[in-house]
Curated annotation (Swiss-Prot):
An annotated GO cellular component: membrane
Compositionally biased tracts (Low complexity): 152-163
PANTHER family: ACROSOME-SPECIFIC PROTEIN (PTHR21859), SPERMATOGENESIS-ASSOCIATED PROTEIN 31D3-RELATED (PTHR21859:SF50)
Organism listed in the record: Homo sapiens
Gene expressing this chain: SPATA31D4
Protein name stated in the entry: Spermatogenesis-associated protein 31D4
Amino acid sequence: MENILCFLNSYTETGLSPDSHCLDIDLNFICLSGLGLFILYLFYMVLTLYSSPTEKNNDTQKHQGRARRKRKSVTFKDRKSLQKEAEEERKLHSFLKSFGPPVSCSPLGQHHDTTLFRRLLCPDPVCRVCNRATADIQRLLSWESLKDAAPSVSPLASSASGAESSFTLASTPSATTPEDLILSSRPKPSPPPPLILSPDLITTLADLFSPSPLRDPLPPQPVSPLDSKFPIDHSPPQQLPFPLLPPHHIERVEPSLQPEASLSLNTIFSFGSTLCQDISQAVNRTDSCARHHGPPTPSALPPEDCTVTQSKSNLTVLKTFPEMLSLGGSGGSSTSAPTTKGIDHSCPASSEFSWWQPHAKDSFSSNFVPSDFMEELLTLHSSEASLGGHSVANIIQPVNISFLSHDIPALLERQVKRRGDFLMWKENGKKPGSFPTQLRPNYQLNSSRNMLTSTAVKHDLAESFPFWASKGKLEWQHIHQQPPYSKCFEDHLEQKYVQLFWGLPSLHSESLHPTVFVQHGRSSMFVFFNGITNTSMSHESPVLPPPQPLFLPSTQPLPLPQTLPRGQSLHLTQVKSLAQPQSPFPALPPSPLFLIRVCGVCFHRPQNEARSLMPSEINHLEWNVLQKVQESVWGLPSVVQKSQEDFCPPAPNPVLVRKSFKVHVPISIIPGDFPLSSEVRKKLEQHIRKRLIQRRWGLPRRIHESLSLLRPQNKISELSVSESIHGPLNISLVEGQRCNVLKKSASSFPRSFHERSSNMLSMENVGNYQGCSQETAPKNHLLHDPETSSDEDLRSNSERDLGTHMMHLSGNDSGVRLGQKQLENALTVHLSKKFEEINEGRMPGTVHSSWHSVKQTICLPEKSHSQIKHRNLAALVSEDHGVDTSQEMSFLSSNKQKMLEAHIKSFHMKPILNLSI
């Protein structure tokens, strides 16, 4: 180790010495290496300056290549899913476009009517989720229309005339009628530049011609469409009418109106670039009722003839408004209501006004104020006040909801549900479909799950069926029929009430009130969406009174007579007489309506459609009525009563019990009263007998035993007094009578109690030793000096005698039955004595007697055994014969009788001594 350190020191010293050449070599090498590095750095900087554009291009190419590889790495399954989503989107667009003709059209696009779609979502006019979904769908359709119309736009530079044809809506009150639509063209010196349309252009146009609220004194002046010019072709000019007025259901128009320049206001006109060539087909499809029940048909005619022919379709919108609801002003206004006659005043449909509102408010967009809508509804309801004595005309919505394919409703529901779930999640769990509590007077806001049970029974006008029909359409069930209320081209329309619980459950949860007047063929009906008609119908349409509910007397309780005692139950014959009302069907008042209740839902059927009930059904209904009356009388349902009768029958009435014991005839159930089987009847009678026996014997045994410890025994005192009166010569007679009483009472007592008492007494184990100890004992000892004997010996002897008698009498079940108190008094003697001895801290007499009997068994002669056998045989013979005489008890010796007498006297003196102390 030391050698290595010396070598290192010498090497470092030579390297660091100034005379060494190693340091010179290192300095030269360092300078050369630094110069080379500097040159390399300069070369690198020059190269980077020249190669930076190339590297950037390479980087972009690399990124593009990565993107291409990512796109190529998409699996076939992802492509299939993307294609499926695109196909679903196309189907949805086509389905939404097929809902109805556009409200207004322009050469560049169409604004489709989403009102029907909005009504299909939910009937709540202020539902935020549904309004947003409708607005999104409307924007989507607007974009699609703009995309479809973009290729068809041609530049105006190629036009020869150099003038633009624009359409204005104007009116001259002095020259033409208010509803004439004059088509005019204004030449321009130069064509305007092409206009890039915004997606909200169609909505703006709809808002321009929206009807003013009912509370506004003056409607807004319509804006000419010249403010937003459209580059259009100079091919045949097209009309551009807008729904300036709500459509009117007109039977007759004033003859002063010229048909050449008049435009029928029964519908919302739609003119599109793709739907303007079916004029001949539209003419062929018209029928006699097309003017009143037909749908809007897009058609285009030359400018000089503005008469529009309507055709028939599945989706129609027919609305009526009175003259006072016209949107035009009195002077110089471009829109005013036509003079109409024969307006249908049969029924109010105030909620239909909300269906015109989406055209003006962008399908219930977010800027729509619910309070304004409610004020309009209330204003429309008060017809006499706001309309100057004119009743509100019908707002007829004949809708025949039919879908092209079964997949379309599911697709629509799935798309809307996604949007609804997202909006609900965004609103942090707020309930969609929240609505003011009081929409109008006497209106109750109920949930859809409580509608069937509460409101439907209350109004008797409800029937529910699902929103999406199984076969792609709703099967309208005609429920309520009324007499004809109006004439429309001499056709009587039937009014029917239907309650529809429809709408997507994720979009709204409250049941709302909108009313729809739907036409199906030649008949029409009022459809109450998640709501029931109330008393406002009777105020608004006196022609259509609300149907009177008919109630079956199924749950009307019969009051019990108050003169009956509390625990007394009615006899079955009395129950039958109370429970048999007259047949409910003849008692109903004459009415054309026929009511049927099904699970708490009452609905009315026309009399001709209601099937007649079979006799079995009538019997079943009568039996249900009787059963309900029985439940009201007895206070418990029949099922509970049967179960209680089987397991725990009620205590019978004491009055009925006494009567039954006097008559000695069991009460039988009449088979005609209740349909009971023979087994159930037998069980019922058996339980009744058992309860009567228990009621006869009074309180249970344990209660009597506890009461016997608190009060002295009267019967024992009476026996002791009789013994003292008659003297010692009658002891045998008294004892024989007492034993006879014990035997008779024991035979009448239930056997189970005898078994328990015999088991209790057999614990003393004195069966064979009693006779021995008593026969061998000196007879004169107790006769001459009974007071000198100890109380314990007397008690033990009396206990053994009593035990012998009880064991002898336990097997004898025959005999005359007497009262229970005598047996209880005899038995409580033993129990009270035991309790007293235990309480006083003395040794029980049974233990002392057992010791005494053991001592006496040592000196037992053989004669005693023979006497015991003879006595046992006599007891068996007496048990076999079962004769209730005192001679059978003669096997008791005088010694035993004296012991019993002494015991009774001492037991009788104890309570007296205790009281004196």
